[in-house]
Each structure stands twice: as C-alpha cells, then as structure tokens.
Amino acid sequence: MMITLRKLPLAVAVAAGVMSAQAMAVDFHGYARSGIGWTGSGGEQQCFQATGAQSKYRLGNECETYAELKLGQEVWKEGDKSFYFDTNVAYSVNQQNDWESTDPAFREANVQGKNLIEWLPGSTIWAGKRFYQRHDVHMIDFYYWDISGPGAGIENIDLGFGKLSLAATRSTEAGGSYTFSSQNIYDEVKDTANDVFDVRLAGLQTNPDGVLELGVDYGRANTTDGYKLADGASKDGWMFTAEHTQSMLKGYNKFVVQYATDAMTTQGKGQARGSDGSSSFTEELPDGTKINYANKVINNNGDMWRILDHGAISLGDKWDLMYVGMYQNIDWDNNLGTEWWTVGVRPMYKWTPIMSTLLEVGYDNVKSQQTGDRNNQYKITLAQQWQAGDSIWSRPAIRIFATYAKWDEKWGYIKDGDNISRYAAATNSGISTNSRGDSDEWTFGAQMEIWW
C-alpha cells in the first residue's frame, strides 16, 4: 500500500501533463504533391499549357514537388473569446534529384481574434500574412479571387441578412517607381507597394440552397515620398465580383461574374499590378525593316471581363464529376490583351470505396489582341487512383496516369535572347517567339497528392 501511495503523486503529475499537452496541442495542416514522370519522346515529364493561358488542366500534368506545411494553435481562450496563431511555409522543387535545395516561402503568419468586440458577436479581427478567403477552381489550379499577403481586417460581421468582411492587403512590385537626379536620368529604382482594399458581403440567401457573395476590391500603387511612378503607369484599378453558389447533388455549382479595370486587370484576381519598369528591343523583318518595341509593362490601362462556371457533384454511388467553363477577355489600351476561354470535365468512376478511375479532358483557346491569331490545346489524362475515401475530394491519393496533349499555336510572346516580352507576334516573326507551333506529345507517370 505504501508503495502504491508513493506512486500516486507521480501518476497525478503525469496525467496532468498529458491533459495539459492535449489542451495545448498544435494543429498540423497542409498540402503536398510529388511524383515521377516520363515523356514519350524521351526525358523527364513535360507539362502542357497553352501560350497565353493563365492556368492548365492539372491531373497528370504537374511537373514539380510542392508542399505547404501549416502549424497553428489556439493560444488563448476565455468563454467564446479566443486568439489563434497560424503559420504556413511552402516549398517547390523540380523533382529531378534526391537533394534539391530551395528557399522556403513564408506564406502565412497571422493572429486571428474571435468574438473580441462585444458589439460584433461572431466576428474575427486579424493581422499578419494570410491566405484570405481565396476562391479557386481546383481542376485547373486557378485562383480568380485572391488578395493574399500581409494585411489586416475584420470578417464575418453578422448583418442579419449576410456577413460583411473588410480587409487591406499588400503585394509589392520590384522596380515599380523611380526618382530623378539633377541630370534628369533614372537615379534609383525602388520597389512599389501595391495596396488592396477589399469589401465582401457573403451568405445572401437567393433561393433554396443558394447563396450569393458580392465583393469590391480597389488597388493602388503607394509610392514613397521623393519617388514617382514611371510615366503612363497604371496607378490604380477596381475589381467587382459576384458569385452564386448552389448546393446540389451532394456537391456544388459556382457561377461567377467579374469585372476589373486598369491595375487590377493583369492578374485578374484582386491584386494590383502596373507600376513596374519598362524595356525595349528591335525586331528586324525579312525585308530589312527594323521595328523598335518599347515593352511598357507599366501600361495595364483597360478592362477585364470574366464569366466562370465550375463545380463538383455526385452522379450516383459510382460516379463523381468536376467541371469548369470560363470566358475571360482582357482588353488593354496598348493592344496587348488576350481573349481566353476554357472548358473541361473530370469524371471519376469508383470501383471500390478506395479505388477509382479518372478521366480529365480539357480545352484552351487563347486569342492575341495584338495579332488576332489563336492558340489552342487539347489535353486528355487517364488515371488509375487509390484514395482515402469514395469522394472526388478524398485525399491522400496515389495515382498512375497517362496524358496526351495536342496543340496548334499561331502566336507567341516575342523573345529577345532569354527575355520574353509581353508583345505578341505570329510564329513567322523575324524574332523568335515562344510559340510551340503545331505538335503533340504524351507523358506517363505516378503522383501522390495529399491535404489534411
């Protein structure tokens, strides 16, 4: 009995330590993909993306190892009030060797405080670097509303008919502004901070199982005293977004309309661009005529329209389906815009709750505003997959795949040595372009993908 009693304080201490450790447990989340692939004509796996398109169909068409490792913890809680600390470090390498060193990207480091304002119950205030309410199409890895970066804001203010969120974030351009010396020449180039102010109203009930989200983003270049933007720079711009989400067939459909102006048109997702520098080069035509191109990447004046429909649904016990259809038109005053439309489907047939076959078919068509020519690409992937569950979203997954791509490109961006301009040219231009011409290729390999 004496021995048992002597052991009791130790047991209590151990139990208390275990409970304390559980109470302070760190949340571990993340995403990763990696694999190996080959190309039919030889060499490592190639990936296929139409020139001028902002994304590609990703199944069996990813050529890098990428990972995001998220660590977070609720560090304080009292009643319904709490503070949460969140971090995210990301890595990307070419998956060519065992040892591939890279500089990590510190993508998130923020604190979120919930229910801290008595008269705004349910709201969250936050500050730091953050992935902020991102909207994307998973099938093509395309982010159409994403103002992520260092920032601060308040979100989920309950208005009764919807929830209001306000945020300010920053995305900096290298070499975006300059000052003058006494001789009126460029004296010093300085990075330009582009600020974005974001207002969103979400959760607006429109119909049974349907909700609407509305958003306005204003982006502007914020120059340092003593510096000025390059002449003609796109100093600011707006983006307006309306997204309707319909819950259906054990999944969802999202219909999106977006309009952007000037500095908000380049990326078209809510981050300002257009204060960057400029360069020039000369093209010599076959008849000896020389044309000088001023590659003024500072000029994004114009507008962008985007109409997008995408979703993921279940078609019964054995079938799931992802799909996307999008039209995007960037019309710039400098005639360097593009018209891009894409359509694709990814059906999944489930042989068992953990084994499936996937087929992804995607088509891209991109027209150059400058040349009037079009680039197009078909891409088809067949994959056999083993995944942790019977949903098209189930991960981790291990898949083996074969991919075929066929493209016919009539234009490319003009190249001057290793530098690629935003100026477009037909494939028979006097200066080489990065157009891929008319060809096809196939690849095969294996890949893992996981999120948790």
From Swiss-Prot:
InterPro entries: G_neg_Bact_CarbUptk_Porin, Maltoporin, Porin_LamB, Porin_LamB_sf
The reaction(s) this protein catalyses: beta-maltose(in) = beta-maltose(out)
Any single GO CC term annotated in Swiss-Prot or TrEMBL for this entry: pore complex
Residues the UniProt record annotates as site (Greasy slide, important in sugar transport): 31, 66, 99, 252, 393, 451
Signal peptide start and end residues: 1-25
Keyword annotations from UniProtKB, A to Z: Cell outer membrane, Ion transport, Membrane, Porin, Signal, Sugar transport, Transmembrane, Transmembrane beta strand, Transport
Membrane topology: Multi-pass membrane protein
An annotated GO BP: monoatomic ion transport
Superkingdom field: Bacteria
UniProt-annotated site: Important in sugar transport, residues: 143
Compartments where located: Cell outer membrane
One Pfam family matching this protein: LamB
Regulation: induction: By maltose.
GO terms for MF: maltodextrin transmembrane transporter activity; maltose transporting porin activity
Subunit structure: Homotrimer formed of three 18-stranded antiparallel beta-barrels, containing three independent channels.
PANTHER family, per the entry: CRYPTIC OUTER MEMBRANE PORIN BGLH-RELATED
Sequence similarity: Belongs to the porin LamB (TC 1.B.3) family.
Function as written in the Swiss-Prot or TrEMBL entry: Involved in the transport of maltose and maltodextrins.
Protein name: Maltoporin
Organism: Salmonella paratyphi B (strain ATCC BAA-1250 / SPB7)
